[in-house]
Amino acid sequence: MAGGGRAAVGRRLLMAAALALAAALSYGLSDFFGGILSKTRSVWMVTTASQLTAAAATAIIALAAPGDPGPADFAWGAAAGIAGAIGISALYRGLSRGRMGVVAPISGTGAALVPVVVGLASGDNPSPLAWTGIVLAFPAIILVPQAGGKRAPVATGAGYGVVAGLGFGALFALIGQIGTDAGFLPIALTQLVVAATVASVAVALHQPWLPRGRGLAPVFAFGLLGTAALVCFLLATRAGMLTIVSVIAALYPASTVAMAAIVLREHIGRVQFLGLALAAIAVVLVTVG
């Protein structure tokens, strides 16, 4: 009986790691295609339209697989939406004023660190092997977005990177607080709040945000990747420890870099390759541990 129980726990943890990895892949692909779409469209419009699409798709999933969410679950979902919008807005502002090699690593580190702290405070107790993977994940997160060329001053965009990291980290941590029987409606609210908040920021900055014109189909498809990412992450938190699944999900820049190399033939430098290798080792250790 004890052996069967341990096997069931092992399968559950493996499923959590697989779902977190699927979330990381979806987030990475979302960033890749979002970056391409934003070259010809307003990033604020792309974000607003994609989040509205994601909210609608998640609501459909919620109707197909209903749960029993309470007021607290919707409160966590709404708070996560505000945090996510802060993260997105700060990231875009940081990338427009500083270098990706400064902003992205700082934001990625914060996205992993905040839920790790929250998970540990909530009683998560990873194994020594999993801890090794968690420790390796942080340099991977920092190294993967690095590009060659001149190094920018660390202060350039660093403040926005910190705010973005805190926002994304809070998003992960808050999603992890949604009840296991709450279904998916709370995260549909998350995406709706992100869309409304980002649109409000765009209005305040006098930036175009309203989806209009032709060629919106790719933007809507981009939104479905956001649905997949958030649904997979929510399911991962229900199957495993927030400490572990958030670290795996925060490795999403690795899939963005890999897609850029495969599709756009962008060169992967030695530093980035080291980051990708560390990310792969971290995922294996966290999963096995």
Model-derived features: positions:
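Membrane-interface interhelical linkers
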Residues: 3-25, 33-34, 38-79, 89-98, ...
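Hydrophobic/aromatic residues within transmembrane alpha-helices
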Residues: 37, 46, 94, 99, ...
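Alpha-helical transmembrane segments of compact multi-pass small-molecule transporters, enriched
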Residues: 52-58, 106-120, 193-197, 229-232, ...
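Structural signature of hydrophobic alpha-helical transmembrane segments
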Residues: 13-26, 67-84, 124-139, 183-195, ...
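Signature of the 12-TM Major Facilitator Superfamily
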Residues: 45-49, 102-106, 131, 185-189, ...
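Transmembrane alpha-helical core positions of polytopic small-molecule transporters
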Residues: 27-28, 54, 80-88, 111, ...
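Hydrophobic transmembrane alpha-helices of multi-pass small-molecule transport proteins
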Residues: 58, 113-118, 129-146, 271-288
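Selected transmembrane alpha-helices and immediately adjacent juxtamembrane segments
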Residues: 155-185
